[in-house]
A protein has these predicted regions:
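Helix-to-beta-strand junctions that scaffold the AdoMet/dcAdoMet cofactor pocket
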Residues: 123-125
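DnaQ-like (DEDDh/DEDDy) 3′-5′ exonuclease domain used for proofreading
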Residues: 1-66, 71-117, 127
């Protein structure tokens, strides 16, 4: 089976396991109808933490996942950066400063996406589509 390869993968390979769990908090004043966590949801927050928070209720239950991650946004203030808490990943990112013309920028983008893709995969049903 083909495998995605990128520089820095060894630093982020298991990062999804170390993301701190933060339970979802219902905000009844922000919704319509009964406040519940078992239907359609809008989750406000860092997507990495939001994905981790969805696991207890939705692991293996999501039929379809569609993502539209930022890529080549042209935004000079952000070029595939990630606000990570892992010292190993932070050390790697600090040692490899991110620049728009950086030859490693796609590797850095893959490092940012990898833990999110791993968590998304955990949410996906056996018969689900990505």
């Amino acid at each position: 089976m083909p495998e995605l390869q990128f520089k820095g993968k060894e630093f982020v390979y298991n990062h999804h396991l170390t993301v701190p769990f933060r339970p979802l908090e219902i905000q009844p004043d922000k919704g319509i109808g009964d406040a519940r966590l078992d239907g359609n949801l809008i989750v406000h927050g860092d997507n990495l933490h939001a994905l981790k928070a969805l696991l207890p209720m939705y692991a293996g239950k999501v039929d379809c996942i569609f993502i539209d991650p930022p890529y080549n946004t042209g935004n000079e203030g952000w070029a595939y950066n990630d606000n990570v808490n892992s010292p190993m990943i932070r050390e790697w990112l600090d040692a490899n400063p991110i620049g728009l013309e950086d030859g490693l920028r796609h590797d850095k983008w893959a490092c940012m996406m990898w833990p999110r893709l791993k968590l998304l995969h955990e949410l996906l049903a056996e018969t689900g589509s990505f």
